[in-house]
C-alpha cells in the first residue's frame, strides 16, 4: 500500500531548509525542542491577541545563538502583529522573553504571494467554513484563486461532517499537477481545522509552486534551494 508522507518533512534537508536552525548537546536538545514548540504555540494560539489569527501566519523560523533566540515570523498582514509604531511587536517580544527566560530577537516579514502559501489557503478556507459557507463553493473558489495566482497545481481535501451531514466523510478537489514524489518540485502543504457547530472539519491543502530550478540555479538545503541536476546528453 502507498503511504502518504508530509511533503514538507519529505523535502526538509534535501531541497527545503529547516524551520529551526541551532545546535545543542544531547542533554539540552530535548529542552530546546520543547522551547521551540512553546514559542510557536504561544504566537499562533495567543490567549489575548485574537488578531494574530487574522494576520495570516505562514510559518515561524527559529535560530539560536549563544546570546539570544531569533524568531522570524512570515505573515500575510504584518501590520496586525507590528501595531502602531511597533508597540504590539515590542509587547510580544517581552512576552516571549518571559515565557522562555531568554533574550528574544523578533522579526516580522511580509509574505509576498499569500495565495500560493498552503497554510494561508487552508486557514482562509477554515474562516469561510466557520461563517457557514458552502464547502463545495469554497473549495472551487480557492482552486480558481490559487491557479490564477500562478500555481502549477493545487489539491484540497476536507474531512468531517461536511454540510452538516450526520455521518462524517471526506471530499477532495484538485486542479493542475501535484507531483508529491518529485523532490525537485516545490510542494507546499498546510493543515488546519475549522470549528463548526456540527464539529471539527479537517482541511488539508497541497500547492505546487513550480520547481526549484525555475527561479535560480539553487544552492543547498540551508537556503531552501535545490541544486540543478546536469542535463544528460544522448548520442544516436
Curated annotation (Swiss-Prot):
Keyword vocabulary terms for this entry: Ribonucleoprotein, Ribosomal protein, RNA-binding, rRNA-binding
Keyword check for Metal-binding: no
Renumbered residue ranges of the record's region Disordered: 212-236
Domain of life: Bacteria
Record's GO cellular component terms: cytosolic small ribosomal subunit
Known role: Binds the lower part of the 30S subunit head. Binds mRNA in the 70S ribosome, positioning it for translation.
This protein's name: Small ribosomal subunit protein uS3
